[in-house]
Amino acid sequence: MEILITYAIIFLLAWGLGAYMSRVFSSERTWLDFLKPLEHGIYWLLRIDPTRGMTWRGYALAILWTNLPLALLGYLVFIWQANLPLNPDKISGMSWDLALHTAASFITNTNQQHYSGQSQMSYLSQLVGVTAMQFVTPAVGLAAMVAVLRGLMGGMGGAKGNLGNYYVDLTRAITRVLIPMSFVLALLLTWQGVPSTFSGAKTATLLEPQTVSAKVISSQTIPVGPVAAMVAIKQLGTNGGGWYGPNSAVPLENPKIGRAHV
């Protein structure tokens, strides 16, 4: 019965979300229209004309232009994280090859991890590097999907060859779909016990000290951080790569059965 209820909830959410996203990308009225000033501020800042349609070539080039600078930013943050803020645990910078692999992996939505985030990434790297790409790459996927559908339906507004404006689609995917849903999901995860803090790692005293190689170990270090914020978009955007090396196998990412349903 529990499985049937879970699938029923998923079906209802998928139907409602699909209808909502259709309105978002069709420029119809939604309950998040109050974000229009923010979106137009982004267009103005980036010198984007939101009314200009794009052909498939223009759309594809715009995707590359968006992804490459973000990958470079992530790479630089990874290798310089030791000298940047939000590093309470004093984690050293990544090697150039590991940083390159990580940036390439997350910007392509491959999300392969050759690192353990809790011990090899600062909070800044986790948020500005990894989490930012976990927002942008699924948003790019949504925008590309919308462009393909417009092409199959004869072009935006019936104008053949007009796939819409990539930057508008990308912005709406982030501001009206991913961020609102991630915000709610992060609150639910925090409620379920997933860490959500900018303080450094915690030290806990063991109830039963252990002896390893003639050395008595009486305490352990528990890495924390703004984990819930990353896990929310990781799951929502079908991203891999969690805050911790073993991902959701770690109790701190997956503390209760309710979190699994979320």
Where are these regions (language model features)?
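Long, contiguous hydrophobic alpha-helical segments, chiefly transmembrane helices and signal peptides
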Residues: 41, 63-66, 100-115, 128-149, ...
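P-loop potassium selectivity filter motif centered on the GYG triad
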Residues: 85-130, 196-261
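Juxtamembrane interface at the ends
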Residues: 22-29, 147-154, 241-246
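Short secondary-structure boundary segments
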Residues: 10-34, 39, 126-141, 249-261
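N-terminal alpha-helical transmembrane segments of multi-pass membrane transport
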Residues: 1-101, 158-164, 168-209
